[in-house]
């Protein structure tokens, strides 16, 4: 992955690494990328050139210019779009002539990729062998919700996982009334109500979002932007459906915000409860989106 010397072509990553999602790159590598690409010079392509190669439009680039770390925001925005991968990022850097970045960060990127692949392999190895009487759910992940089968043979499933902050619980309760207790008869997964205590929150969220829930509703607010748990859940759901092709994630804005709407969700159609002109259609639109096959 790293070049062999000054001016040399960088060796391409192995196919398995090329296809890895951008989530494989840790914070340290992203920070060092910012140090290289945030600097505007006449002799080397910066983050704006990379954004153009990623097919960002002019207005999108202008918006990113207002961010304190535009490279980081660019990567966060891009990783949810179709075709985003570690391999593609390296190809674009090479195309822009940034061999200095590839030489300097190549070993670190390669190490991140190895760790990511190893983690995936370890998780796969930890899955027990299946027998006829056991469902595909992981046994240690059985009995995690109120109505779960403790033996794991009939895990509880939901129409949608609700990603929210505790401060937004009143709106979540209204969502329950509008979507569960009406003719829509949808089944929502609300952590404070449905999830049993005593298990790692990250493991439970991953299991529910990936295997138990067909969709995920993100209740976006100023407090949501400060929540590490919500950030993890959102990025995990996006990684399961890059580019939102499967309409898996639905952002909901239910009150005005002082902070900027999260860039990682800007490319997905929002269900806006704050717009008085469309408020009467809000629950119908949301219910219909959650009812899609």
From Swiss-Prot:
Modified residues (Phosphoserine): 241
PROSITE patterns: DEATH_DOMAIN, TIR
Localisation: Cytoplasm; Nucleus
Modification note: Ubiquitinated; undergoes 'Lys-63'-linked polyubiquitination. OTUD4 specifically hydrolyzes 'Lys-63'-linked polyubiquitinated MYD88. Deubiquitinated by USP3 that cleaves 'Lys-63'-linked ubiquitin chains leading to inhibition of MYD88-induced NF-kappa-B signaling.
Signal sequence coordinates: none
Alphabetical list of InterPro entries matching this protein: DEATH-like_dom_sf, Death_dom, MyD88_Death, Myelin_different_resp_MyD88, TIR_dom, Toll_tir_struct_dom_sf
Domain TIR: 156-290
GO cellular component labels: cytoplasm; nucleus; plasma membrane
Matches recorded under Gene3D superfamilies: Death Domain, Fas, Toll/interleukin-1 receptor homology (TIR) domain
Swiss-Prot/TrEMBL GO biological process terms: defense response to Gram-positive bacterium; defense response to virus; inflammatory response; innate immune response; MyD88-dependent toll-like receptor signaling pathway; positive regulation of canonical NF-kappaB signal transduction; positive regulation of interleukin-1 beta production; positive regulation of NLRP3 inflammasome complex assembly
Domain Death residues, every copy: 32-109
UniProt tissue specificity: Expressed in esophagus, duodenum, jejenum, ileum, ileal Peyer patches, mesenteric lymph node, colon and spleen.
Keywords: Cytoplasm, Immunity, Inflammatory response, Innate immunity, Nucleus, Phosphoprotein, Ubl conjugation
Region (Intermediate domain): 110-152
Keyword check for NAD: no
GO MF annotation terms: TIR domain binding; Toll-like receptor binding
Record's subunit section: Homodimer. Also forms heterodimers with TIRAP. Binds to TLR2, TLR4, IRAK1, IRAK2 and IRAK4 via their respective TIR domains. Interacts with IL18R1. Interacts with BMX, IL1RL1, IKBKE and IRF7. Interacts with LRRFIP1 and LRRFIP2; this interaction positively regulates Toll-like receptor (TLR) signaling in response to agonist. Interacts with FLII. LRRFIP1 and LRRFIP2 compete with FLII for MYD88-binding. Interacts with IRF1. Upon IL1B treatment, forms a complex with PELI1, IRAK1, IRAK4 and TRAF6; this complex recruits MAP3K7/TAK1, TAB1 and TAB2 to mediate NF-kappa-B activation.
Function: Adapter protein involved in the Toll-like receptor and IL-1 receptor signaling pathway in the innate immune response. Acts via IRAK1, IRAK2, IRF7 and TRAF6, leading to NF-kappa-B activation, cytokine secretion and the inflammatory response. Increases IL-8 transcription. Involved in IL-18-mediated signaling pathway. Activates IRF1 resulting in its rapid migration into the nucleus to mediate an efficient induction of IFN-beta, NOS2/INOS, and IL12A genes.
PANTHER family attached to this UniProt entry: MYD88 (PTHR15079), MYELOID DIFFERENTIATION PRIMARY RESPONSE PROTEIN MYD88 (PTHR15079:SF3)
UniProt remark on domains: The intermediate domain (ID) is required for the phosphorylation and activation of IRAK.
Name of this protein: Myeloid differentiation primary response protein MyD88
Highest classification ranks of the organism: Eukaryota, Metazoa, Chordata, Craniata, Vertebrata
Gene it is expressed from: MYD88
